[in-house]
């Protein structure tokens, strides 16, 4: 169960399965792990993997955040496939994407219903405070937004990139 997505990833996965006319009652834990394949968090990957078609990926964070809110509101989102591919296997309750910036793997988080629009800035401020207190932190950044003070992002600690590509750490 530790490898299965939490609230946000589970919501995206269930919406994807419904989109592709799959009965959720027929989907087993092993099916869900196969869908995660090698895109999950941490060191584990699952084979044989089952995948959904992948659409063009958008780099407009404000648009992705808006589409996350639609999904959280149980509304239709034309970006469901994209959001699933960017973060549907991630843990946690909050919407997020996993992406690459300058060849390095990052996680960028978006506010959920219970968060204010300044959630990203607040998390960034907490990370700055933790670093000032000499707490070891992954590299982090506040990504700009025209809709809110910004989106918190952190370099993934479970991946390492080099000339041969991205490798799992653990």
Each model region followed by its residue ranges:
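Phosphate/dinucleotide-binding and metal-coordinating scaffold of catalytic cores
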Residues: 1-170
């Amino acid at each position: 169960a530790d490898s299965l997505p939490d609230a946000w990833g589970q919501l995206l996965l269930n919406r994807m399965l419904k989109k592709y006319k799959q009965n959720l009652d027929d989907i087993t834990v092993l099916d869900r792990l196969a869908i995660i394949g090698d895109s999950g968090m941490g060191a584990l990957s699952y084979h044989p993997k089952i995948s959904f078609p992948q659409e063009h990926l958008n780099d407009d964070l404000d648009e992705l955040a808006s589409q996350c809110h639609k999904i959280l509101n149980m509304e239709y989102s034309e970006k469901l496939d994209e959001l699933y591919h960017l973060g549907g296997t991630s843990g946690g309750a909050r919407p997020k994407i996993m992406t690459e910036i300058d060849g390095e793997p990052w996680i960028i988080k978006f506010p959920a219903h219970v968060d204010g629009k300044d959630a990203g800035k607040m998390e960034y401020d907490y990370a700055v405070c933790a670093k000032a207190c000499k707490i070891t932190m992954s590299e982090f950044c506040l990504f700009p937004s025209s809709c809110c003070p910004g989106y918190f992002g952190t370099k993934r600690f479970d991946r390492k990139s080099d000339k041969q590509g991205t490798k799992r750490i653990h």
